[in-house]
Amino acid sequence: MYPAKPAASSSQPAAEMAQPVVGIPISSPGAVAVGPVVGKWSSGLCACSDDCGLCCLTCWCPCITFGRIAEIVDRGATSCGVAGTIYTLLACFTGCHWIYSCTYRSRMRAQLGLPEACCCDCCVHFCCEPCALSQQYRELKARGFDPDLGWDVNAQKAAAAAAMYPPPAEGMMIR
């Protein structure tokens, strides 16, 4: 029923043979990707129709969307309220809120291993701020975060998922 074990005279020592993968499966419910995951954006810059509620929120109150993004990207060091307030003050008094938000796009790209768009992050935010913020928000959701809940709840969910899915013990059967 099971294939025979490789012969002891194998060219590779047992320590060099395939080792079990240790960690949390990314597809498990409630798991949050912790390390950088290199790849593409999960949605396009102009895919606002993918989430109409988010699109409306971002068009009418971009400070809320930005605050939620900033809290996740900063891993709780900056609260949604503080980031949103700074964004609003910059928008009202200088009109340069896009400079502040593009720095978070750059940081998010670096954390998640995402490629830069055909133009730099600041150009994306300057030309279409609502689209850029919506894309960032959708990406965080696609990566397992829920920006609506804030960093603390997302971190608790990740810790609970880690506790529920312990890594396999050494010495278990390997196929």
Swiss-Prot record:
GO cellular component, one term: membrane
Pfam families in the record: PLAC8
Coiled-coil region list: none
Intracellular or extracellular location(s): Membrane
Keywords from the UniProt entry: Membrane, Transmembrane, Transmembrane helix
Domain of life: Eukaryota
Tissue localization of expression: Expressed in roots, coleoptiles, leaves and stalks.
Membrane topology (UniProt): Multi-pass membrane protein
Assigned protein family: Belongs to the cornifelin family.
Protein name: Cell number regulator 9
